């Protein structure tokens, strides 16, 4: 009986990691669509967001079934609760990437664009944080989770610097307001995306240590 339960817990973790990988792939495509202003790719990202939503629902149903039908130990409870909470964060992260794709559709050519290099670095760091987290999670590496979450401070710095630049450009040139507004949405989505990564890092620390920490 216990062996079967352990197998189900392993399958649950694999489903969670698969959802995380799907979010990572979606984020990569969203940032590529942004860099290339590829509206066709942006449309595809928006249309496929339901796959992430379905993945979240399936994982939550599995968690509920395991809690209701099995007799989990304390460590099992921590694991299932951590997965359930974290998959909700992954779903929201997918929503933010769909939000970036929607903003790409609204961008006008030959109008305001902020520091592309800084925006690229912000996106690149967000992707690396999620990729590192997906490696650390199955290993239950709390120390790695803490170091990943600490990178959110750099994301915030990018956000504030880009916000200041974009608002300044919008003030100087009224015609830049439509694009500027969309870029403010974009960097806001990236900032929240990284915040959710930090949330999952907190759950990974809880999973290993049983301690509730604030890393965000």
Curated annotation (Swiss-Prot):
InterPro entries: P_transport_PhoU, PhoU-like_sf, PhoU_dom. Gene3D superfamilies: Phosphate transport system protein phou homolog 2, domain 2. It is found in: Cytoplasm. Keywords: Cytoplasm, Phosphate transport, Transport. One of its GO terms (molecular function) is protein homodimerization activity. GO terms for biological process: intracellular phosphate ion homeostasis; negative regulation of phosphate metabolic process; negative regulation of phosphate transmembrane transport; phosphate ion transport. Its main location: cytoplasm. SUPFAM superfamilies: PhoU-like. Pfam families: PhoU. One of its GO terms (cellular component) is cytoplasm. Homodimer. Plays a role in the regulation of phosphate uptake. Belongs to the PhoU family. PANTHER family: PHOSPHATE-SPECIFIC TRANSPORT SYSTEM ACCESSORY PROTEIN PHOU. This is Phosphate-specific transport system accessory protein PhoU homolog. It comes from Streptococcus pneumoniae serotype 4 (strain ATCC BAA-334 / TIGR4).
